[in-house]
Amino acid sequence: MTDVTVADIAPAPLAFATRLGASHVENVSGGEEGLKAQAASRPYDVAFEVSGTAAGLASAIGIVRRGGVVVQIGNLPGGQIPTPSNAVMAKEIDLRGSFRFGFEFMNAVELIADGSVDVLSLVTAERPLSTAPDALRLALDRSQSVKVVLTAN
């Protein structure tokens, strides 16, 4: 992968994506016009939907090229959700589900162990175990953190 675009509604995850090497970041809190304009000139081959929202899934379907792939990673709400099924059919999109934490866990451990993945770059804060309640509040605040690690004190 040489061209990676990350879209989010919060500035902190976008700044983090830039630090990790994203080619382009797009703040979609005010709408998706910029993302759609970029996709209109160069549709994406693959889109990973990680927000777990129907709007996120519809957006991913809308920005991939004909024959592109949309991978649903975010946990969608239960029940029926509106999906632009005609766009999936007309654009011949490959819509894939991904059950996180299934068989991938051992693969992830192996990638971390052999150094293929630098997990420390994902850590945005370390807090002592004695401050666990505050650390958990920080971890829930996407505007300030990506991953928070508790350390033994």
Regions found by a protein language model. Name each.
Residues 54-114, 152-153:
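Glycine-rich phosphate-binding loop and adjacent beta-alpha segment
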Residues 11, 58, 102, 106-153:
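C-terminal hydrophobic helical "lid"/dimerization subdomain
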